[in-house]
């Protein structure tokens, strides 16, 4: 089904994988070096066209367009305003697809929307009102273009199937673009994803995506690299099918994606009235990839990602045949994911040897596409979901899709079967809509199934869980009233209905400034919208207290700052910070704020020892070796340790919440994604790396760590950072900071990106 090549591989004429350089020469009659062949990837060409550094090893990228949704654009624009924003220099689309229900906090969600609308007018942007489209579907329909690059403040910013290299990053990276700065990275590796064969009837894009995620996540095969889709199997897939695979590449932890394009993508642009934005893309005659994943589409069967990660993948048939073993494995993994905070079991879902689920949902940027929903309607037509616990909801990804589904009868078929068809909303993907009952088990064609991502509150003793599946198998399960069923078991005649896009919907409702700013527009600030608090520059010496210690193999951004209803407070930095690590380590906020008292005293010109008594013996021990430490040259803050933090969302708040609570650093064995590490840096936090085994650390939660001359070490680009765990003695430890650009070092020295741009 899938094969991962050990090392790099050549692709000759877009069809033949060859690992031996001599064989390439024999096939082509010419000698091609790896260095030359690397420049023949589609990714290289697009990056080269957007790089202004003149150095293809150290890229400085200028994007063509930007996009954000309503739980990120407020913080981004507030940061940009504090840094000197006068006008959006490139198209910037603000969608309102996350806090759309306005069910939490009174007026605060709609207040954010009004902030967005007035900013779009004032600075020259585009505003997509609530329920019109989810962020990524609008981008596909209206923004993507062949050979273009788009940066979004959402991790699933992926439009590679349309020939657009798109990346999801934390808000500060968008701020840089808004201020006419660049996105600075080393040239990423490019991994070929070679598609062969053709999917069998009943297999959908989520099945292919989950198979790829299952093969590449744990081993980091594509981590922070570009996935480039090639091979004869590509042409066997519709545009919608490719889009459905592409959006899920984020769950592999790749940096971006790009696909070869053809007449099916050309037709997509024509349908959306943008034929001029199509560009044919293909790899060169001889292309070298840093790795290669071979995918035989014909062998893929309906898949399921069991709780609590998209990489926890099985075929549905495997689950049904080995039900007891699979459920036991899921429950054992849950002990780690949930820290034993609640009792979790799926055994009660087994009735007469069959697994029954409580809820089915098809939604958002992954599931809400036209073809997915049409296929679901074809499957469920003539069936009904029953009048018991099982519920089934479908969220088309945009109003134009919804309208076409109404016109072609798909909505009627779904509703007659008992399905509820709702508006374009990302809620089921991040815990703000269709939260199941306690102990319920939901199957969803959405992007993630992290703990509590469906909206349950662990700190209240609640637990529900989600398995990811394709829309087709979810509909098959719904047709069987919740009995887990692969779509390949259903005898269905798929209509294959043609899509018609009605552009009048957006023309009549979306505000588009066409790049014309109106500086006289007054921004509407809701009561919950607050400015970022002042942040200090990096001190000469740093005293850190470890205030949380996490030993999970991977820590997600959902654990660092929860999603769901918590997201409504993202316009208020200090208010949101109260929820930091609330599901993983409820005592974290209190510990961090206690340590922060010392730094606030320093900033007020007072003695930190007077407000934090426990600091007295710590400083006494430090001054035995460093007698000058503490005399106007020290900062005090908190740090967390996590094995591998930062998987999941691009949300900058995973870092900024730590910062506004006095965080100065993270310590990790590695960082799960480039975007989380960038968020730390942009908020002035040191991304320390330790080589120590997480089971044998030199420090523990509650310990103080002294980092002498940290400012000088950052300035001098020191390879290693010497620090001391403060106890009865000073125990030396060594950290590294990893590769950093000069600008990133300066941001840390200044204390945060806002300070950096203020000068």
Walk through the language-model features, giving the residues of each.
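Fe-S-dependent hydro-lyases/dehydratases of central metabolism
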Residues: 1-759
């Amino acid at each position: 089904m899938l094969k991962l090549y050990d090392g790099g591989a050549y692709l000759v004429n877009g069809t033949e994988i060859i690992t031996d350089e001599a064989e390439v020469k024999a096939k082509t009659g010419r000698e091609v070096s790896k260095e030359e062949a690397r420049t023949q990837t589609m990714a290289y060409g697009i990056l080269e066209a957007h790089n202004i550094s003149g150095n293809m090893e150290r890229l400085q990228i200028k994007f063509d367009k930007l996009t954000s949704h309503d739980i990120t654009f407020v913080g981004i624009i507030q940061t940009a305003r504090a840094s000197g924003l006068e006008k959006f220099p490139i198209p910037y689309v603000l969608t309102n697809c996350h806090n759309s229900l306005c069910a939490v906090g009174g007026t605060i969600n709609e207040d954010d929307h009004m902030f967005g609308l007035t900013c779009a007018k004032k600075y020259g942007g585009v505003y997509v009102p609530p329920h019109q489209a989810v962020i990524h579907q609008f981008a596909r329909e209206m923004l993507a273009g062949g050979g273009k690059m788009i940066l979004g403040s959402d991790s699933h910013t992926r439009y590679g199937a349309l020939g657009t290299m798109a990346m999801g990053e934390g808000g500060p990276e968008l701020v840089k673009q808004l201020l006419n700065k660049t996105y600075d990275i080393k040239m990423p590796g490019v991994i070929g994803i070679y598609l062969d064969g053709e999917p069998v009837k009943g297999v959908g894009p989520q099945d292919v995506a989950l198979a790829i995620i299952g093969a590449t996540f744990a081993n980091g095969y594509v981590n922070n690299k570009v996935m480039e889709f090639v091979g004869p199997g590509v042409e066997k897939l519709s545009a919608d099918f490719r889009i459905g695979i592409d959006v899920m590449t984020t769950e592999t932890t790749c940096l971006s994606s790009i696909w070869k394009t053809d007449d099916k993508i050309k037709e997509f642009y024509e349908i959306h009235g943008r034929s001029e934005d199509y560009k044919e893309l293909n790899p060169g005659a001889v292309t070298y990839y840093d790795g290669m994943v071979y995918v035989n589409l014909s062998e893929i069967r309906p898949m399921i990602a069991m709780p609590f990660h998209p990489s926890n993948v099985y075929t549905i048939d495997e689950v049904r045949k080995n039900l007891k073993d699979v459920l036991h494995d899921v429950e054992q993994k849950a002990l780690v994911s949930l820290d034993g905070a609640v009792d979790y079991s799926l055994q009660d879902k087994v009735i007469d040897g069959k697994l029954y689920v409580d809820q089915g949902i098809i939604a958002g940027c992954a599931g809400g596409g036209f073809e997915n929903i049409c296929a679901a309607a074809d499957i469920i037509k003539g069936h009904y979901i029953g009048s018991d616990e099982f519920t089934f909801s479908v969220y088309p990804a945009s109003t134009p899709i919804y309208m076409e589904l109404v016109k072609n009868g798909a909505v009627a078929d779904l509703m007659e079967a008992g399905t509820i068809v709702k508006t374009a909303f990302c809620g089921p993907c991040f815990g703000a809509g269709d939260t199941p009952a306690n102990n319920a088990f939901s199957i969803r064609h959405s992007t993630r199934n992290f703990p509590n991502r469906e909206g349950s509150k662990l700190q209240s003793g609640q637990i529900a869980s989600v398995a990811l599946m394709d829309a087709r198998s979810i509909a098959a399960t719904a047709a069987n009233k919740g009995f887990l069923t692969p779509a390949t078991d259903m005898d269905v005649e798929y209509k294959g209905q043609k899509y018609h896009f009605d552009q009048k919907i957006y023309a009549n409702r979306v505000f588009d400034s066409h790049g014309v700013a109106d500086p006289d527009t007054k921004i509407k600030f809701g009561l919950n919208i607050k400015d970022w608090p002042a942040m200090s520059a990096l001190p000469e010496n740093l005293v850190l207290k470890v205030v949380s210690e996490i030993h999970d193999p991977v820590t997600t951004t959902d654990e660092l700052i929860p999603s769901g209803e918590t997201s409504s407070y993202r316009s208020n930095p200090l208010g949101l910070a109260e929820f930091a690590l609330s599901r993983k380590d409820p005592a974290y906020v209190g510990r961090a704020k206690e340590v922060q008292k010392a730094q606030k005293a320093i900033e007020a010109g007072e003695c930190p020892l007077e407000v934090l008594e426990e600091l007295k013996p710590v400083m006494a021990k430090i001054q035995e070796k460093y007698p000058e430490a503490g005399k106007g040259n020290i900062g005090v803050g908190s740090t967390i340790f996590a094995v591998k933090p930062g998987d999941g969302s691009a949300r900058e708040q995973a870092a900024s919440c730590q910062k506004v609570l006095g965080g100065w650093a993270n310590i990790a064995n590695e960082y799960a994604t480039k975007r989380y590490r960038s968020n730390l840096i942009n908020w002035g936090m040191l991304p320390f790396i330790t080589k120590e085994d997480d089971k044998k650390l030199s420090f523990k939660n509650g310990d103080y760590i002294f980092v002498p001359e940290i400012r000088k070490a950052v300035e001098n680009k020191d390879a290693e950072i010497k620090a001391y765990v403060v106890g009865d003695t000073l125990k030396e430890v060594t950290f590294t900071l990893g590769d950093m650009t000069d600008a990133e070092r300066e941001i840390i020295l200044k204390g945060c990106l806002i300070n950096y741009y203020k000068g």
